[in-house]
From Swiss-Prot:
Reaction it catalyzes: IMP + NH4(+) + NADP(+) = GMP + NADPH + 2 H(+)
Superkingdom of the organism of origin: Bacteria
GO biological process, one term: purine nucleotide metabolic process
Enzyme Commission code: 1.7.1.7
Function as written in the Swiss-Prot or TrEMBL entry: Catalyzes the irreversible NADPH-dependent deamination of GMP to IMP. It functions in the conversion of nucleobase, nucleoside and nucleotide derivatives of G to A nucleotides, and in maintaining the intracellular balance of A and G nucleotides.
Alphabetical list of HAMAP family matching this protein: GMP_reduct_type2
Entry annotation: catalytic residues: C176
Family, as annotated: Belongs to the IMPDH/GMPR family. GuaC type 2 subfamily.
Residues reported in the UniProt entry to bind NADP(+): 205-228
EC class (word): oxidoreductase
Species name: Shouchella clausii (strain KSM-K16) (Alkalihalobacillus clausii)
GO molecular function, one term: GMP reductase activity
InterPro entries attached to this UniProt entry: Aldolase_TIM (IPR013785), GMP_reductase (IPR050139), GuaC_type_2 (IPR005994), IMP_DH/GMP_Rdtase_CS (IPR015875), IMP_DH_GMPRt (IPR001093)
Protein known as: GMP reductase
Amino acid sequence: MMENVFDYEDIQLIPAKCIVGSRAECDTSVELGGRTFKLPVVPANMQTIIDENIARYLAENDYFYIMHRFQPETRLAFVKDMHERGLYASISVGVKEEEYTFVQQLADQHVVPEYVTIDIAHGHSEAVINMIRHIKTHLPDSFVIAGNVGTPEAVRELEHAGADATKVGIGPGKVCITKIKTGFGTGGWQLAALRWCAKAASKPIIADGGIRTHGDIAKSVRFGATMVMIGSLFAGHEESPGDTIEKDGKLYKEYFGSASEYQKGERKNVEGKKMYVEHKGSLAETLLEMEQDLQSSISYAGGKRLDAIRNVDYVVVKNSIFNGDKIY
């Protein structure tokens, strides 16, 4: 049993002496797979969060993205299209038999996505290990992200199999109900799980799920994340794929979990739910606000670059930093 676990709202980072005149001097960029991105943030590879248009926008503006895998037949054309535009391609695959064929097809046509994410709910499995090896055999130049996992053993095993990065988080997301349906996961202690996994990792980690505020991005970086995957904070933008509905004069967009019945069109093996999030305006505004908030975080950390955050002290505030005020 692990003692003393904690989550985002239980932690406060402690400021160090500021060395910049303005937060604008702080650099939030991060490197992953040989490319530099503006932010250590990636929108969740979910159907209500990302589509081709958003992927294109993110790539054009030096942000990281991972395209979802819920329209598998469009992926080949998507990779080709991104490459024709001079942009990088980043896609997701599962572990079923047809995915092996798809990887082979990419290799046969010499269509090599720069990033391939193997994305299943319980990533510590032979199925994922076999798929990592398959991709590394046929697409050796692709950067492989594998997940999702929640233990140091899983991180070590996937790295050993050839994964270039691992994705950590089992069911902590806002529309993920794995924790409720199964009793398993990192819900409620995602930040401690991230720290535990990061200590075992020799390659980058993507923290996935449980982010509710921009400050949580800085906390993720402090505890070892190279990238932070975010769903609900990216849901509900003008550009977001979901349907817009009006209720009591307010605009909302739908947001659902990747294993929800809305996603699957069926009621079996449901581990996701649907919710409506308030319409948030443009994606560019949110990305800018995230950048500015993270620049402030870096200035509080006493540095000029993102890495400064990794060295700050922290306290565990067991009464929750919101003191009963719900801000989300």
